[in-house]
Amino acid sequence: MAWLRSQVALTWLAVTLASACTDKSAPEYVADQFVEAYFRRMDQQAARQFTALGATEMLDRELELTRSVRADGYTAEQAAAEVVYRRTARNKRGERVRFDYDISIKHEDSEEHRAADVELANIQTVWKVVRVEVKAR
């Protein structure tokens, strides 16, 4: 019985430590959440919460361009394709942090590969995506 209690305690400790390792204020977490919303779910509104400055302006322009299509009932879920992304690099640029991502987008009959450069700045103690550059690979 003591062995079982110790195993349960160790399992609980491992789960607690694993969940604590996800620092939701870290720039990696913010960048990954932005990429998940913007590229994988194709949901500019959800991605917007992770942005500031130029990235927010970019999303506002995209939301304005898609407003009429969305008003007709076309949703982000319908727009979403099968998207796989992988963070490949982290670089400092002055006070900012840049993350590179490889992004693969599979449509019904084709596949696209893109490279995304996602730059974050610490604005009032919160990391925000401030610039996004996407290139075909």
Task: Identify the role of each PLM range.
Residues 89-137:
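Exposed beta-sheet edge and beta->alpha loop/turn motif
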Residues 33, 37-41, 50-54, 123:
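Structured segments of extracytoplasmic/periplasmic soluble domains
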Residues 44-96:
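Short solvent-exposed beta->alpha transition segments
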Residues 5, 12, 32, 80-81, ...:
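Low-complexity, intrinsically disordered short peptide segments enriched in small/polar/basic residues
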Residues 4, 18-40:
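Short, low-complexity N-terminal intrinsically disordered segments enriched in polar/charged residues
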Residues 20, 26, 59-63, 117-121:
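A general secondary-structure boundary signal
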Residues 1-19:
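Sec-dependent bacterial lipoprotein signal peptides
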